[in-house]
C-alpha cells in the first residue's frame, strides 16, 4: 500500500534506514520522527515558489523524465523544484516510480541523506532498493549498500538483474563468501549469464584473487564482447603474479576482436611492470599510441611507472614532458622513478616544479622526497618539507602514521641533525621498532655510543622487541665509540637472549669494532671461522684496520682475499695502495696501479657537495661541468697559493 509522503512516520522505516536519520536524543523522544521528512518537504516546497508556472503542464511521466536529466547533470536544484511540484500535485501517492526517480536523482547528486528520507516515504520495491544500493556504491559507501541489500532480502524482495551489477561494484565491503552467496542467488534466479552480472562477478572474484572462480564465470558467459570482462581477468591474473596467464587472456581478447580500451592497456602494462618484461611493454606502448590511448593520463602514468621500474629514465621523462595534463599520481610516479634511478638532484628539482605547478604533495610525495634530502644531506629542504607537513596538517601529535614520522626522523639522522631527529621521535604517539632503530643507528654513526645504548634500554622497557636491524645499530655504536666489551656481549646475547641469528652484517660490525681497537688477530680469526664472513665487506674492513694500525703482513692476506672476491672493484686496490704508501713501498704502489690498468679498474671519483641558498652543488674529481667551474677553480688556486705562502701543504703535496 502506498503511504502518503506527508504522513509517513519513521516507525515505518526499517532499522537499516533509521541510522541515517537525526539522532538528537532529546528531540527523538519528544516529537514524532516524521519531522525529518517534514523538514525536507518544507525545503522542496519552497523551491517551487521561484517559478510556480514552470512545471504547470507536467504529468508524472514528464516529471520522471526531467528527474532523470537532473540526475545525469547532477542538477539537484532543479531536482528539488520537481520534487516540490510532485508533492503538491500528489504524484508521489499515485506512482511508485516517482519515488524511485527521486531517490535516484538525490543519490546521483551525492545527497544520500535525502535519498534515504525519500526512500523511507516510498513504496518498497526492487526499483527503489536498486536506486539506493547504486547510490551508496557511487558515493563511496559500499558497506551501506551491502546492508541495504541484506534488508531488501529480509523484507522478502527478490533482486533483479540490475541489482547485482550495482551491488558487486561495492564488493570492497564484502568477504569472498559474500560474493559466492550473491553469485549463488544470481544463478538461482537465472541472471548469471547476463553480461553485466557476469562482469561484476569476474571483477569481484578477481579482487579477491580467486581467479579460478573468475575464469569459470568468464568461460560460461555467452556474450563476452565487453572489454571490462577481459580487463578484470587480466588484472586478476596479474595480482597473483600469473603473468603468462594474463598475457594469454590479452592475446585471446585481441583474437576475438574485442576492443582494447585504456583500462586494457594499463592492466597489461602493470603485468609487464611487475615482471620486468620491458620489450613486450614497449610493444604495448606502441599499441596504446596506435589506438589513441597513448595520451591518456592513466596510460601515461602506467608507462612512466613501467619504464621507471626498468630504470629507463630517459623514456619515462619523455612521456612525462609530453603530457598535457598531470595529476598527483603523475608527479609521484616520476619522482619515484628519479629517486629509484639514483637521480637525487633531479628528484628535488622535480619536486620544486611540482610545487610551482600548484599540485599539493601528499604523504606518498613526501616519503619519496624526504629520503632524497637525507641522501644529499640537504637539511634546508628537509626542514622546509617538515614545515609544510606541520602547516598542512599531515603531521601532528595525534597521527598514528609511524611511516611518515620515521621518514622525517631518518632524514634528520642522515643530515647529522640528531637534535631535530630526537624531537620528532619524542613527538610520536606510537613508536614501532623502526622508530627506535633509526635513533639507535643515528646515535651510533655519530659516535654517541652511550646515547645509543640508553635508547636500546628505553626500547626494551617500552616493550618493543628488538630485531636484526636493532643489533646492527648497536654494534655500529659500539664500534664507533670503542665499547669493545659491550659489543661482544651484544653479539653473544643475540642468540641466547633474543633468539636472533647473527648475519654477515652483524659480524662485519664486530670485526670492524675489533679492528678499530687494534684487535686485528681476533678480527682475522673471527673472519676465517665463520663462512658467512667471507665477503668483501668484512675483508675490506680488515684491510682498512690494517692500514690504520700499520699491520702490513695481515694487510697482504686481506688484500689478496679481497682481490679474489671482487677483482673488478677499485676499493681493495686503493686500500692496498694506501698501505704501501704509508709503509714507503712505492714500487708496490706502482704494481697495484699497473694491476688496476690491466683489469681495467677505475677508481670511483671522489665526490663532495655544499648546500647553498639556490640548492645543492655537487663536485666530482676531474669533472669540469659545473657552470661556475672557472670562478671556483680560480678562487681555489688563490687559497692554495696563500696556504703555500704560510708554509702549509695540501694533501697532494
UniProtKB/Swiss-Prot annotation:
Question: What is a GO molecular function of this protein?
Answer: RNA binding
Each PPR repeat, start to end: 59-93, 95-119, 125-159, 160-193, 194-224, 226-260, 261-295, 296-326, 327-361, 362-396, 401-431, 432-466, 467-497, 503-537
Show the segment(s) annotated as Type E motif: 538-613
Q: What keywords is this UniProt entry annotated with?
A: Repeat
Where does the record place the region Type E(+) motif? 614-644
Which family is this sequence assigned to? Belongs to the PPR family. PCMP-E subfamily.
The protein, known as: Pentatricopeptide repeat-containing protein At3g14730
Tell me what organism the protein belongs to: Arabidopsis thaliana
Its ancestry begins with:
Eukaryota, Viridiplantae, Streptophyta, Embryophyta, Tracheophyta
UniProt lists the gene as: PCMP-E31
